[in-house]
Amino acid sequence: VIFIKREFEAYLDELASITILLPTERHHGESTHFTLLFQEERHQLQIIERNQLADYVKYRCETKIPILIGSKYMVEDEHGRKTDLQIGAVIRTEAFDEAYYYDGEDLGTTYYPGETVFTLWAPTATAVKIKLNAPDSNELIYYSLIREEKGIWRITVQGDLEGFLYTYLVCVNLVWREAVDPYATAVTINSEAGVIISKEKINLPKIPLPPFRRPTDAIIYELHIRDFSSHPKSGMNQKGKYAAFSEQPAYSSEVGITGLPYIQELGVTHVELLPVNDYGGVDEAEPEKAYNWGYNPLLFNVPEGSYALDANDPYSRILELKQLITTFHQHELRVIIDVVYNHVYVREDSAFEKIVPGYYFRHDVHGMPSNGTGVGNDIASERKMVHKFILDSIKHWLTEYDVDGFRFDLMGILDIQTMNAIKSLVDTHKPGAILLGEGWELNTPLQTDRKAMIINAKKMPGIAFFNDMVRDSIKGSTFNLFDRGFSLGNTHKTQALKQSLSGSINFDPHFKGLFLEPTQSVNYVESHDNHTMWDKMALCVSHEDEKIRQSRQMLATSIILLAQGIPFLHAGQEFFRTKKGEENSYKSPDSVNWFDWERKQKYSNEVEYFKGLIQLRKSHGAFRFSTSLEIKKHLTFPIEKGHLLMCRLNDVKSYGKWNQLLVIFHNGLQTETVALPNDSEWDVLVYEAKVSFNAVQKVKKEIMVGPISTVVLGQY
């Protein structure tokens, strides 16, 4: 960026309002009048307000002529000094949004073998050029784009441009900036330029799965592309790559079945992938030298290159990610992708900021970028063209990659209108796709009643939220390491646990409920963020031996899998995943983050228990009601005393094999005798960390419940 020396500065802050800053070092910052110059025309500005600042006098002026944004204007003071009229805060006004909103479907590139059309939205630019670089050539070709209505710039370039690299050169406020197309769908290594590709070469056959019926039928398993295969004993050859998931069969002589077959054996329904779109923090040429979770978005419509077999080949990452999703679908597993529309990696370097400076991000009352995300910038999703970009991006992932859902990072930054529009779009293109997100309240300049956060969940039916109340009631606070939840022996969390088990709905007068329906509650005790449960327990209950801690984690996981709502599981939770005590492993080495396949083998009995609980949940609809009415009709809590909580599911024969189900959660260290509700026999389905569907064991009247355990009984 070249520094422009100006005698004074003038900014268009509203469509008819100009702010002028005159330095006091000359004429004491005084001017009795200002003139707006446009081509050969001269128009007097009306001074509305004058304020003395430390080094400037600030004037607010109004113009009676319409300003054509994207045209060159000059402002002249009474002393004959001139400066260019810069684009200021006008771009963050509703009037600007209305005037320059473009609803076309052609942003980006449209490739044909004989020509390519380039379309860019850059309303504040006074000139736009495209820089083309032929493949395997150093020759650069420049073309000037033609400005059209609504701030659109367009050009059609003749010839077959497949494989050509391209970037835009955009002039705003006299400064030229080079940027990658934010609508690019293919890029060079490390995203230095967009690449023109042929869609015919990336068309893989899609595997149609029937629409997913109910969100509460889902069992979500969260994992990171690189983590899953990077361990030396993973049995996968393409370690850290998309391609690892397509290796069949994946097997290690030391740890048995691995890879995708292992996920399929677990019985989960959806795999949620940490971000797979292009991100910063890892050099795609040498990915082994750094690690990152992927929450540093660079380009939103391009797969990350560090997971590709050949990041230099723009087709590689696209085809390999598509093949990964196709392979999952072949195995009747669905794919949710983690999307990060709340911020960019570095605001100043982003394509958004270079092409339309100041538009795509929120600013505070002082005009400074807001930082509710904690990473230096907040995406302004409420602005029309930001809203459109997000919806266009969602549509791209649905139609091009055939994903089955989206997890929205820091969703509380986004606005409710955008999230509901996404829900409508997704329902149209992929009925049954799941939308879930982090509904935390964040300090961003958007009205509270417009934020897509958990306290506004009832305004967003059909969108699910990570339920931190569930997490804290079972495990204990994430932010207070020594706070213990029910599974860690805290009997004071029993009331909160009842709310968690009932889907966090309006279950009784004591709890007004977070959600309209249980389909909005994502129930979890751990995720990629913060300590794993195993690592928290190493600090929180360090005095307890390992066997007791295993029982506590198994109790916690059983609650997640038997509660009303959507169960969410962190990959490796089934074998007590550890990150060696690291609380925030977002850039820690593979040895901290990898999926430790040796633990899977070491804790094979516990993994089998995990599988059994999943099968139990899937076998009976009473564990996964989709409406609050069903929960209120069938769920009661007949016993709540000390370390014990009993749930009863009544009259549920229409949902599965058993008419009555009892679930007992026990967090105490002593065996307890529990009286059963009637004199008839009960099938023992879950007992002593084993799951059985064959009714090998039956009980009547009472049952002995062992320390820190879960018991499930069924009656016809």
Annotated model-derived regions:
Residues 507-508, 565, 569-582, 592-661:
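Glycan-recognition and catalytic regions of carbohydrate-active enzymes
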